[in-house]
């Protein structure tokens, strides 16, 4: 543990080239798991790398009856347990001087008056300059009451060149109607340009690298079209169950929790056209074009699949099925696995199926985008020389082991012509000596500096729900989801969905 106060970041460090202005961040739900494990460590790591202005302040808002010292101890413990850059007393002392805590419930007007007084005191004493962001790390059901009190106390109002912003966590509603209702609540007190919707997957280095790989390398972009691409598979798999999240997860499920935001955003980045300029407006516009061009399959019964994990053995241990988890009703129809087939009706992607799947208690923890290329039209040494899966593929590994894998055919050493699949791998951890910023570091800094390319616009949110709502409505009429064994890759119906098309799921 070092006591030396760190200097500003290395000027050659271009991973996060901007520094926040003088500002404050207010976190509602400061005692939740997200704040404790992700937000507080990310804020500290930004400060530890010299990327937060010395005037930065952090205010927590929660029901706990804490003294300032209690709050400091909580923040420090969270940082020490989860920091990525190592604990430094100098950084901590600088950050600690800007810590404040306001005790109160979300519906307590007096608590918001105390919060307004705290914000004014920080502007006066700390020099935050009237710039404040409000992070709603709380369930969406509390958004209306928090928004109302922020408005009633004038905390959403700015003067001159000051700014006030709001950062909200998913889910952005549970269907199109509720998403619009939430947007209406927020838009009454904040302009759209001041609303930052967090999808932490968009802050991951590999996701941002999709655009760099496509548009900075002439070898990939010419092949990135229906002429050469057979299909695209986007997978987000977890090898764990719901744990203690029954209250959140039941009634939401894999499709709402993962496909509606993470996977449709990954699909949009994969399928979008090159923006004229690398600006938030133009990147968002290209993603919106993709989402608006999505077409559902005609028969949802055979081209979608949903499931629930059953009890069984996984990783050498006996695990409970979803319906046996604490807090889950015995008749729950919530999906813990979801798979869908979509089409993007543009000239580039006409006829190319996009297969999206997400689930819990699957074979391994992995998130990847696999662009599967068409087989060679003619092979001079005969198809018998090829392996059964002889298709080139470019796989973008989002997590873990971030990187790229190119699958291609190569001759097996020997006297006969036999071609087998081999891979060429690029791994971030091997190619770059420095660590990539954690996703929340990038997103929090972007929100503080007002850069929005990695934050979905409300139009993207609504377009995503327009895609998913018909599927969810159909599933509601289908009774209980199909069960699948833990440690497998989902229900049989998901495999049948691709088998009918003469394809199979890639094994990550």
Task: Describe the predicted segments one by one.
Residues 1-168, 172-508:
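Secretory/organelle targeting and membrane-embedding segments
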């Amino acid at each position: 543990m070092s006591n030396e106060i760190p200097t500003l970041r290395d000027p050659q460090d271009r991973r996060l080239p901007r520094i926040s202005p003088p500002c404050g961040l207010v976190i509602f739900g400061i005692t939740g798991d997200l704040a404790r494990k992700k937000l507080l460590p990310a804020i500290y790591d930004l400060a530890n790398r010299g990327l937060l202005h010395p005037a930065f302040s952090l205010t927590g808002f929660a029901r706990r009856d804490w003294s300032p010292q209690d709050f400091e101890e909580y923040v420090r413990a969270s940082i020490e347990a989860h920091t990525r850059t190592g604990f430094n007393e100098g950084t901590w002392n600088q950050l600690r001087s800007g810590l404040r805590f306001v005790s109160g419930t979300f519906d307590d007007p007096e608590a918001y008056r105390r919060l307004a007084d705290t914000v004014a005191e920080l502007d006066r004493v700390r020099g935050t300059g009237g710039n404040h962001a409000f992070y709603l790390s709380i369930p969406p059901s509390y958004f209306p009451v928090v928004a109302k009190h922020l408005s009633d106390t004038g905390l959403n109002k700015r003067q001159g060149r000051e700014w006030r912003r709001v950062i909200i966590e998913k889910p952005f509603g549970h269907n199109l109607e509720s998403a619009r209702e939430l947007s209406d609540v927020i838009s009454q007190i904040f302009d759209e340009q001041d609303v930052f919707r967090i999808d932490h997957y968009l802050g991951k280095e590999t996701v941002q690298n999709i655009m760099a790989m496509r548009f900075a390398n002439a070898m990939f972009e010419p092949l990135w079209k229906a002429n050469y691409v057979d299909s695209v598979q986007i997978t987000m798999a977890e090898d764990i169950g719901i744990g203690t999240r029954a209250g959140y997860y039941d009634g939401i499920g894999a499709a709402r929790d993962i496909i509606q935001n993470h996977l449709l955003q990954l699909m949009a980045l994969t399928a979008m056209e090159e923006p004229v300029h690398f600006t938030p407006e133009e990147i968002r516009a290209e993603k919106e074009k993709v989402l608006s061009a999505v077409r559902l399959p005609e028969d949802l019964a055979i081209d979608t699949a949903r499931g629930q994990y059953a009890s069984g053995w996984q990783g050498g241990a006996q695990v409970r099925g979803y319906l046996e988890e604490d807090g889950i009703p015995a008749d729950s129809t919530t999906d813990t696995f979801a798979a869908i087939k979509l089409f993007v009706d543009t000239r580039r992607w006409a006829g190319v199926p996009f297969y999206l799947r997400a689930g819990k208690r699957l074979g391994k923890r992995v998130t990847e985008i696999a662009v599967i290329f068409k087989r060679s039209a003619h092979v001079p040494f005969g198809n018998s020389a090829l392996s059964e899966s002889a298709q080139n593929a470019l796989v973008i590994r989002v997590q873990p082991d971030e990187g790229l894998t190119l699958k291609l055919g190569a001759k097996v050493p020997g006297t006969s012509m036999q071609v087998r699949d081999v891979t060429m791998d690029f791994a971030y951890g091997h190619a770059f000596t420095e660590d990539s910023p954690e996703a929340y570091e990038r997103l929090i800094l972007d929100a503080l500096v007002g850069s929005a390319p990695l934050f979905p616009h409300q139009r993207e949110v609504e377009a995503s729900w327009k895609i998913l709502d018909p599927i969810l409505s159909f599933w509601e009429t289908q009774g209980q989801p199909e069960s699948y064994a833990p440690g497998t890759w989902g229900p049989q119906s998901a495999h049948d969905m691709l088998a009918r098309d003469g394809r199979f799921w890639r094994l990550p």
